[in-house]
Amino acid sequence: MKKLIIFIFLSLILFVACDKLNQEDYKKFSYDENISLYGTPENNQRNWNLSCDGSYCKITYSVGTPLKIHYKKELTLNEEEKKKTVTALIKGIKKGKDFSGTQDYSPTNHLLLSNNKEYHGKTENEEFYKILNELLGENYSNIIQRY
């Protein structure tokens, strides 16, 4: 039993160490959470984007085919906030909610860092929505309902 606990602990350390971020890695980044809703052909694409360049950051929400921006918010984040955000985004991509068995709902996500390292997923990144609520100062679903 002790060997199993030690193995799990070491595996977790290696998992966290693999994604150790340097400040230059997240100086500039862009994250997209795209959702395809196959039951509504006129507006079947929805996209959230969070991007930062230095301390300047922007959140956009786009709807439609082709995508058209309906909501935009600009904000500033310090280095510690950006590091926390990027770390949570990576965690969420790796552990996102899987909808592969669902035919009418298809989420995908993509994170691009300053060092050109990319993370991709075909899951709903629940960590992203927690971050989004915090940065928006309201629940993201309120914005979805408006558009």
List where the protein language model places each region.
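Short, well-ordered, aromatic-rich surface patches in folded extracellular/luminal domains
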Residues: 19-40, 99-147
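C-terminal motif of bacterial Sec signal peptides marking the signal peptidase cleavage site
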Residues: 15-17
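Bacterial N-terminal signal peptides
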Residues: 7-13
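Post-signal-peptide N-terminal segment of Sec-exported extracytoplasmic proteins
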Residues: 38-68
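A short, structured loop/turn motif at beta-sheet edges
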Residues: 53, 76-84, 113-117
